[in-house]
Amino acid sequence: MTPRMTDRAPDRTSDRASGQGTSLPAPAWQVQSLLLAYPDEHLDGRLRLARRVAAALPEPVAAPLRRFLDHAERTGTARLAAEYVEVFDHRRRCCPFLTYYAHGDTRKRGVALLRIKRTYAAAGLRLTDEELPDHLAVVLEFAAGEPEAYRKLLTEHRAGLELLRLALHDTGAPWAHLLDSVSATLPPLGGDEREAVARLAAEGPPEEEVGLAPFAPPQYMPDPVGGRR
């Protein structure tokens, strides 16, 4: 199921998004997280918050964020929600689940999901039963609360993030602007990362080896990519 980010985000948004007591990426990551969730009845409030936050962000981060906001405000919640489903639920190349790019729908992805969930739990953070821990909106939300700890998680999946960004641009999806904004908060791609992006683009994510059973508990094994989460 697509995260809707309504249970936790309102309680933890105000200080982070205003920049109080946080390092620079935290306010950006918080609003990027909210805007990468499914557009629902809270969208108008999120857009207003994001406008205020964008005014205080560096231009490379703020400019693409404003481009997304312009589109969302023109489009409205219902049409944007329909676009969201078309882009993220029906197009494998636009998968928002970061471990998919590194591991595909293999047993290794289940192990990676379990590791991420344990990382969250060690920090006292809990997911709902409907949320997978590697959805970009979820990763960004938690990164906003622990910027240094979770920057590593984002950079570990830098190649997948870049491939998602490129795929969104290829399809003309407005969320490409949000990925531009996210990328502007991270270090530039290194040579190895560029090679990984090129390899992923050419070959796609890994496929499961025949005859090997999953090593993670069944509850942490994702459904195949391509449907609502």
What annotation goes with each model-predicted range?
Residues 1-7, 16-136, 140-229:
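Charged, alpha-helix-forming regions
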